[in-house]
């Protein structure tokens, strides 16, 4: 089977290529060097000959510091319109299936109960809105194209960026963190497990899925795991959640504090699939990459 992967040189795409090849798929890797900007006019068709399945990873990523004048328009241009263009080209080229990597942010920022395929969509920022609108476009094409949608929670692994690498750096520097009394629950998915889940999605029943490690953690316990992999002590102290929220607001770190203290879990139900890698092993691999990268820096 021929599988085309967009965003093939990215964080997830690099890992996915190897996993697909290991499973015996013929992989066609596509990056922006081949297709240019991703929007409603992208020329996908020349790359789709004899392709059976597309895994669509390419997109405009969520960022902590947005610089665009109209962020929603920019996200829509790439994530919604670019996906719609790809899907239409896929149908015209005879592609059988499209696997779309969306985000749990489509469901919101917190959850009282694990998100699943019946949970309502509540996107709250331009990135999540654009991902949800892309999903809606794909849903409208289900009669012409098999659609598999993944909404992963936070993804971590070697080469990770964003909040996870920031957390590793804080623990590595020995900075005391006021999270000892936080009892939240967060779902995560390691890079190895996500790549394996996407491989499962290439042949699974079309639908909406929420992959995870199936080992939900509190922020405090996640920090302890990172500290253990760094051979450091987890420097945690208690602070009342309300006081912590106020401190985060005053420091301009409200979004980070909300992510560390709020709960967000998913059901992780992919029929017939189990995570091949433990969270402890993936965290150790991530921390080893971090320490190797730090030592390699001038």
Name every feature range the model reports, one short phrase each:
Residues 122-148:
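Active-site Tyr-X1-5-Lys
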Residues 84-126:
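Conserved Rossmann-fold NAD(P)-dependent oxidoreductase catalytic core, especially the SDR/UDP-sugar
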Residues 3-23:
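N-terminal Rossmann NAD(P)H-binding glycine-rich loop of SDR-like oxidoreductase domains
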Residues 191, 220, 224, 246-285:
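Conserved C-terminal active-site "lid" loop/helix of NAD(P)H-dependent oxidoreductases
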Residues 108, 148-166:
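Flexible, glycine-rich beta-alpha linker
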Residues 197-253, 284-298:
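Mid/C-terminal beta-alpha module of Rossmann-like enzyme folds, strongest
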Residues 40-81, 85, 89, 106-109:
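NAD(P)H-binding glycine-rich loop region in Rossmannoid oxidoreductase-like domains
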Residues 85, 160-166, 180-202, 206-210:
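Substrate-positioning beta->alpha
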């Amino acid at each position: 089977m021929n599988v085309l992967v967009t965003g093939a040189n990215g964080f997830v795409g690099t890992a996915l290529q190897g996993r697909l090849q290991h499973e015996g798929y013929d992989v066609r890797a596509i990056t922006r060097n081949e297709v240019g900007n991703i929007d409603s006019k992208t020329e996908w068709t020349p790359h789709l000959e004899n392709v059976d399945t597309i895994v669509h990873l390419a997109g405009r990523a969520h960022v902590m510091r947005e610089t665009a004048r109209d962020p929603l328009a920019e996200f829509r241009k790439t994530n919604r319109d670019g996906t719609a263009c790809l899907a239409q080209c896929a149908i015209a080229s005879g592609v059988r299936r499209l696997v779309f990597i969306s985000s749990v942010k489509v469901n919101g920022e917190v959850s009282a109960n694990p998100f699943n395929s019946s949970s309502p969509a509540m996107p709250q920022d331009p990135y999540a809105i654009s991902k949800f609108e892309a999903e809606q476009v794909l849903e409208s094409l289900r009669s012409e194209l098999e659609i598999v949608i993944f909404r992963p929670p936070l993804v971590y692994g070697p080469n990770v960026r964003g909040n996870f690498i920031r957390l590793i750096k804080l623990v590595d520097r020995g900075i005391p963190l006021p999270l000892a009394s936080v009892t939240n629950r967060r779902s995560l998915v390691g890079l190895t497990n996500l790549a394996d889940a996407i491989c499962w999605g290439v042949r699974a029943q079309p639908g909406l899925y929420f992959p995870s490690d199936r080992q939900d953690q509190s922020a405090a316990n996640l920090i302890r795991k990172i500290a253990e992999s760094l051979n450091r002590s987890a420097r945690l102290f208690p602070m009342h959640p309300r006081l912590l929220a106020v401190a985060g607001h005053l420091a301009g770190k409200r979004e980070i504090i909300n992510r560390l203290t709020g709960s967000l879990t998913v059901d992780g139900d992919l029929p017939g699939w189990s995570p091949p890698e433990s969270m402890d092993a993936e965290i150790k691999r991530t921390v080893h990459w971090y320490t190797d990268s730090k030592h390699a820096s001038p």
